[in-house]
Amino acid sequence: MSYSAPSQITQRQLAYFEGKHVLIAGELIDDFPFELAKHCESTSIFTTNYSYYKQFAEHDSIHCYFGSELTETTNADMILLYWPKAKAEAEYLLTMLLAKLGKSTEIVVVGENRSGVKSIEKMFADFGPINKFDSARRCSFYWGQCTEEAPTFNQQDWFKEYQVEFENHTIEVRSLPGVFSHGEFDKGSELLLQTLPALRGHVLDFGCGAGVIGSVMKTINPKIHLDMVDISALAIASSIETLKANNLEGCVFASDVYSDTKENYQFIVSNPPFHAGLKTHYSSTEELLEKAPQNLTHEGQLILVANSFLQYPPIIEKAFGECLTLAKNNKFKIYSAQK
């Protein structure tokens, strides 16, 4: 098994974990927890990534928690934090987990240098000492300990609130750190919404993020039955709050592409993700496009926005036989296909 660079540097420092009950969190993408479990008392995972949760939920040896907040009781006395792409998400996870685990908790932080992992030095200052103990593979390995009482964590304090103006409608948006387009109206989403036809029936908002697209669709087309899905628990929590803030109804749930969805959508609408961590990542969107026909009703329609450089039309044409470009500007294109 080839481990990620942060896991490889952690593997060099296994002595730090001996005798510990380790809770792993953050931007973890490989099977390293199985290796780590051989060297510590117990290993558990807290993840906001539904795909990663499903991967580990099948194994009894490592307990895996999924959600936007760790609410379960744990005996962990050490956190292994894989530094996430967004600094604000790192701060959110750190504050939440230390509030849960409490004073005297040890922490190891690993991450690629270009991800900004050095920020942990200032971020952890109010909790206790932390120092870098290793550097390799353009990554850093920090160890520290919480010597101060962590403040009480209230998730509601972490929602960023902002407004989106679309046509004559004002949408109140509530967004947690780590959610796509946190705090702003994405220009691709705006072009997508400007291009959408009148919607009816069962509509899927794939990769719902903070819930902007779904909320606008439901506001303009109040009779639709709206499903909103995302792989991120932070996005799910944000979309639920955004719907609530606008007195809108929709079904919001985690799904690894179509793993938990139905198969009778009149419309699948998406501003699909193509960044996973610091790397460009297409596989989930490819699955979205390839399997769209079997998840649409007769004459059902797929409509998505994408950066112009992404090679989605050939995938859509292979799945549907045709791909239309409904609109474009200097950065984005709106693609459509009908079953």
Swiss-Prot record:
Pfam families found in the cross-reference section: MTS (PF05175), MTS_N (PF08468)
Subcellular location: Cytoplasm
Any one GO molecular-function label of the UniProt entry: nucleic acid binding
Catalytic activity, reaction form: guanosine(1207) in 16S rRNA + S-adenosyl-L-methionine = N(2)-methylguanosine(1207) in 16S rRNA + S-adenosyl-L-homocysteine + H(+)
InterPro entries given in the database record: DNA_methylase_N6_adenine_CS, Mtase_sm_N, rRNA_ssu_MeTfrase_C, RsmC/RlmG, SAM-dependent_MTases_sf, Small_mtfrase_dom
A GO CC term assigned to this protein in UniProt: cytoplasm
Coarse class of the protein's main subcellular location: cytoplasm
Superkingdom of this protein's organism: Bacteria
Alphabetically ordered keywords of this record: Cytoplasm, Methyltransferase, rRNA processing, S-adenosyl-L-methionine, Transferase
PANTHER family linked to this entry: RIBOSOMAL RNA SMALL SUBUNIT METHYLTRANSFERASE C (PTHR47816:SF4)
Function: Specifically methylates the guanine in position 1207 of 16S rRNA in the 30S particle.
Subunit structure: Monomer.
UniProt record similarity statement: Belongs to the methyltransferase superfamily. RsmC family.
HAMAP family: 16SrRNA_methyltr_C
Name this polypeptide is given: Ribosomal RNA small subunit methyltransferase C
UniProt organism field: Aliivibrio fischeri (strain MJ11) (Vibrio fischeri)
